[in-house]
Amino acid sequence: NNTQITNSSFTGTIVSNDKQGKEYNVGGLVANLKGGNSLISQSRADVTILAGARANNQRFGGLVGRLENNARISRSYVAGKIQNSTKNGQIGGVVGSNYFNGLIDNVISNVSGTNVYSISGDQGYENNRITEAYTVEGNTTLENDKFVTSTLTLNQAEEKLADLDITTTLE
């Protein structure tokens, strides 16, 4: 609760090799972000996530594993690869799950992978509050991510990224 992260970045690899199927959240910046005053803004990640989700309560996101209780991701960017060796879990380029009442606006997902959605891995949650969520063309992800606002060319994504005013670097 009450966590504020601004102009933060992460570059690296996260490997999950859980064999028991217990609930957990994994994110490039934060595992679980919750509470109305919690915010990730103007942040970015370049991640490789290697997952083998055993159950749907295992969540992986390029920025946040689970976003809930009015916590928010805004003006942020994620790139990289997420490989889920199973068809289980909630795996998303930006967030694993947005349940319950997380907010996402003005994000770009330049994530490719196996058994991963571009934006949110929780495609069954109908009350998602996701706006201005973009993916970059040419990335291999699961089709029909209902939370993608539109698909951008790489040039369009670079222009939009400049507008996000992210000053942190990945170096």
Where are these regions (language model features)?
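Predominantly extracellular beta-rich ligand-binding scaffolds that present long acidic/polar faces
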Residues: N1-E171
